[in-house]
Amino acid sequence: IAPSLVGSEMCIRDSNIGDNLSVDCMIDVDRRNNIKVNHTATHLLHQSLKDVLGDHVNQAGSLVHPEYLRFDITHPNKISSKELESIELIVNQKIDEDITVETSIKSLEEAKKEGATALFGEKYGDQVRVVTMGEFSKELCGGTHVSSTGKINKFKIKHDKAISSGIRRINAVTHNQVDLYLEQKSEELGLQKEVEQKKTEEKQSQSILLN
């Protein structure tokens, strides 16, 4: 498929498709918009990781889901809480700046000269699609994105973990999913406090009975 075209794969169920038929193709708009948000956030996360951890960071895997994003990177060490906070802060700063997201078709050579990030080991054609977010991020990418970073609204890293030697996985959420995640964490914390309070009360009761 040429860089300027988008291909879609369909699965036909319980229907016979013949020649010369006219069909209407529709997308789930809400699902697509959520994917756009998380995909653009992934680009911001990628560059923020490089800024905080170093240029050795490369993408080793990625999943853009309507409800969350998952990003695997090359990094030999555990990412500290302070580093995660810095990464999260940078992403949210770029969201607040509401940077315009621009796409363009360029030659692979021109894109590389401009410093566009490419996936290691990926095979590209002579013409590539470049997604640019101001001076902050420039990547070769054929995916769908929001028109500006402000549409992401907010960004929160849920956790990171090692999945193999030298590879770490980061899970994060954006937009309304951030509020849902924080509410869930608050409820879990409240339940934990209740359990601890009951344990304390039981110990106090046992102490009184023994005395």
What function would you assign to each model-found segment?
Residues P66, I73-I163:
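Non-catalytic interaction/regulatory segments
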Residues H56, I152-K154, K158-N211:
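Terminal appendage regions of diverse proteins
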Residues I1-G7, C11-I12:
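Single conserved hydrophobic/aromatic residue that forms the stacking wall/gate
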Residues G18-I73:
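Active/ligand-binding-proximal structured segments within catalytic/core domains
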Residues K36-T40, L44-Q47, I79-L89, G125, ...:
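Generic recognition of stable, solvent-exposed alpha-helical segments in well-folded globular domains
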Residues S15-N16, A162:
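Glycine-rich, small/acidic residue-mixed loop/short-helix segments
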Residues L44-V52, S86-E97, V173, Q177:
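Generic, well-ordered alpha-helical scaffold segments in large soluble proteins
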Residues D30-N34, K78-S80, V178-L180:
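Short beta-strands and strand-coil junctions in structured, solvent-facing domains, enriched
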